[in-house]
Design a protein with these regions (language model features):
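A short, Lys/Arg-rich alpha-helix, primarily the initiator
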Residues: 1-16
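"A position-specific structural signal for the A-helix of alpha-solenoid helical repeats
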Residues: 9, 75, 79-82, 111-122, ...
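Alpha-helical residues within helix-turn-helix
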Residues: 12, 22-23, 51
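Short alpha-helical DNA-recognition segment
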Residues: 16-36
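DNA major-groove recognition helix of helix-turn-helix/homeodomain DNA-binding modules
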Residues: 47-63
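Short, charged recognition helix plus adjacent turn
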Residues: 65-91
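Flexible helix-coil transition and linker loops at the boundaries of alpha-helical arrays
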Residues: 66, 101-111, 126, 142-158, ...
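Helix-turn-helix repeat elements of alpha-solenoid scaffolds
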Residues: 85-99, 126-147, 174-193
Length: 196
């Protein structure tokens, strides 16, 4: 899919859902990036486009959004990392994470968010350090949701990765003795239902 079609899709969905550019861009890119993308100009990289499309509740063919080799390498590393974590191979995951950190633009909130999420998961699952995991998950959430607050969660526009991160955060809170997953689970379900 070329940038003109991606931009048209984003604009169509954003207008249809009555979502402001400001709200869609919050925490992931500038408003001008969305305006340029909607106009069919090169404005956003793969990970930003993926998050924008996700926040609009759309699934996408990730390969079609990729615009360069580095995006593909980072995407492949994310897939390998996820696989190693699912297999509980935390040492291998840590090696892949170091490789990811070396390749990724850590100025990008989306890459930093992913790194902190993985570090949080390893802290939680391998080291059973729920306090460090809580810190990592919270820092990751606030990278794309700078005014993150569970009490105001309904006001935020969340993409798939942010929902996964939020569930990890709340699940870890359970391990710290805070019963928040049940309290905020209905809001998460509403997001999932809206995205279907």
């Amino acid at each position: 899919m070329n940038i003109v079609k991606i931009g048209a899709l984003i604009k169509y969905e954003r207008v249809k859902q009555n979502i402001s550019i400001e709200k869609l861009a919050k925490g992931i890119c500038s408003e001008s990036v969305i305006r340029r993308t909607e106009a069919g100009e090169r404005g956003a990289g793969f990970f930003v486009l993926d998050m924008i499309v996700s926040r609009l509740g759309r699934s996408d063919n990730k390969v079609e959004l990729m615009q360069d080799e580095k995006d593909y390498e980072l995407y492949e590393l994310r897939e390998k990392l996820t696989s190693e974590i699912e297999s509980k191979n935390y040492d291998e995951a840590a090696k892949l994470l170091a490789e990811y950190e070396a390749l990724a633009d850590i100025e990008s909130p989306l890459h930093t968010q992913f790194i902190k999420m993985i570090k949080g998961f390893i802290s939680e699952e391998k080291h059973l350090d729920f306090i460090e995991a809580d810190r990592s998950y919270y820092q990751a959430l606030t990278l794309t949701l700078p005014e993150f607050s569970l009490e105001k969660l309904e006001n935020d526009l969340l993409g798939e990765n942010e929902l996964i991160l939020l569930i990890l955060y709340l699940n870890n809170k359970e391990k710290l003795g805070e019963n928040l997953l049940k309290t905020y689970g209905i809001i998460i379900l509403d997001y999932i239902i809206k995205g279907v």
